Amino acid sequence: MNTISSHSPIHVVGGGLAGSEAAWQIASSGVPVILHEMRGVRGTDAHKTDGLAELVCSNSFRSDDATSNAVGVIHAEMRMAGSLIMAAADRCQVPAGGALAVDRDGFSEAVTKAVHDHPLITVVREEVTGLPPRDWDLAIVATGPLTAPSLASAIQTETGEDSLAFFDAIAPIVYRESIDMDICWYQSRYDKVGPGGTGKDYINCPMDEAQYNAFVDALILGDTVGFKEWEGTPYFDGCLPIEVMAERGRETLRHGPMKPMGLTNAHNPTVKAYAVVQLRQDNALGTLYNMVGFQTKLKYGAQADIFRMIPGLENAEFARLGGLHRNTYINSPTLLDPSLTLKSRPGLRFAGQITGCEGYVESASVGLMAGRFAAAERKGEAISLPPATTALGSLLGHITGGHLVTDEEPGKRSFQPMNINFGLFPELQPGSIVKPEGVKRFRGKDKTIMKRQLIARRALADCATWLGQESTLAESA
């Protein structure tokens, strides 16, 4: 017999963007919630206040264009779902062109006040030093990239030594459709067929000696981002920034990630490439490819300019640029089920940046979903996942299984934090993109814009349907 009443509280650990949003969604569903936040008792190296949802870096939530920008689409979906984070951001907006930027102090104060004022939310200022106790039958861990060492250790003990990363090492990701396949070709090194492979699992970009030397020079001269004082220098074996490798010797890269051995240019088989940049499929949809071994601390502008020097990537569009940061996150594709529940511990969910999403709104959106899922579970309702065609659903799908983990590197390095982008969405149905009347040539940028507009329109329509279905369930419960 179930002795847990429908009014037993759900516990949320962490009062950042994800935790605050999760608590709000739970309380908005009529379920009490206890929000545990350690700041006020113990600080972090990055936070300056004890306010909820403090923004420690930029004050920008990025593009607010819901017609053709994936970030704008997730903004719109979160607003439709009654997001506290988006409501506070809209209330505290400051001028920023097409972006949604906020007064950071006012934003945190607005979130803090809303959470404290909600009658179903209790805020407890304390450090949770281990995994939530089992008598917290439903709980969400949303402790973010600066998770306290004691809790991180407990998570690692529960999930396994290789399941938790403490720094991300992000290589750029390129939209497949922007790669010039008249220059590049598909081939695995030595035509090796790995598990699930075909022997043609990589896209290869060839360089001659002059191109290689110019590329190395650009890497060495490129502007880089320094580590924060509290981050230290987390270089570890097999994960050096590409520009650091270039500085260690002109030939280092062509004997490392850019080695040409075992590869034959399908367009020019008799000419041996001096160096080769490889891109590996990053998601199950096959829309995104990551640049193998290209983790970097180069500034974003420098990355785009330098990486477009690579033959075949002259017109590359990047879904994500590279980076190396202090960041605690779990290997979500192997550890979490589709409702963000830890497979080894029913009732315990993870949310926010610790799940391997990247960005303010992405973190908050995962908190939104975790909160809704936990509330539904508490009320005995079937958990309704957002459709894969929505921004929420596409991000959820990537975190909980859409990323392809390879056997060639440890899982925690293979799975790296991801922001929302159109490469995570399912493709449109064939024939969806129709050339406008009166237009003679319809390709390139114009076609891409229409494609993204159609994906955005589909996402918002499907999200509205999903939320309407949830409302019907709630009303009939």
From Swiss-Prot:
| Alphabetized SUPFAM superfamilies for the sequence | FAD/NAD(P)-binding domain (SSF51905)
InterPro entries linked:
FAD/NAD-bd_sf (IPR036188), MnmG-rel (IPR002218), MnmG-rel_CS (IPR020595), MnmG_N (IPR040131), TrmFO (IPR004417)
Q: Which GO terms describe its biological process?
A: tRNA methylation; tRNA wobble uridine modification
Record-annotated residues binding FAD? G14, G15, G16, L17, A18, G19
Would you say which domain of life the source belongs to?
Bacteria
Question: What GO molecular function terms would the record report?
Answer: flavin adenine dinucleotide binding; tRNA (uracil(54)-C5)-methyltransferase activity, 5,10-methylenetetrahydrofolate-dependent
**Cofactor requirements of the protein:** FAD
What Pfam families does this protein map onto?
A: GIDA (PF01134)
GO cellular component terms, alphabetically, are: cytosol
Enumerate the subcellular locations listed in this protein's record, separating them with semicolons. Answer: Cytoplasm
Where this protein primarily resides, as one coarse class? cytoplasm
Catalytically driven reaction(s): uridine(54) in tRNA + (6R)-5,10-methylene-5,6,7,8-tetrahydrofolate + NADH + H(+) = 5-methyluridine(54) in tRNA + (6S)-5,6,7,8-tetrahydrofolate + NAD(+); uridine(54) in tRNA + (6R)-5,10-methylene-5,6,7,8-tetrahydrofolate + NADPH + H(+) = 5-methyluridine(54) in tRNA + (6S)-5,6,7,8-tetrahydrofolate + NADP(+)
Q: Which UniProt keywords apply?
A: Cytoplasm, FAD, Flavoprotein, Methyltransferase, NAD, NADP, Transferase, tRNA processing
Q: Give the EC number(s) under which this enzyme is classified.
A: 2.1.1.74
This chain's function reads: Catalyzes the folate-dependent formation of 5-methyl-uridine at position 54 (M-5-U54) in all tRNAs.
NCBIfam families cross-referenced by the UniProt entry: gid_trmFO, PRK05335.1
PANTHER family tied to this protein = GLUCOSE INHIBITED DIVISION PROTEIN A, METHYLENETETRAHYDROFOLATE--TRNA-(URACIL-5-)-METHYLTRANSFERASE TRMFO
Q: Which family does it belong to?
A: Belongs to the MnmG family. TrmFO subfamily.
- Record-given protein name: Methylenetetrahydrofolate--tRNA-(uracil-5-)-methyltransferase TrmFO
**What is this protein's gene name?**
trmFO
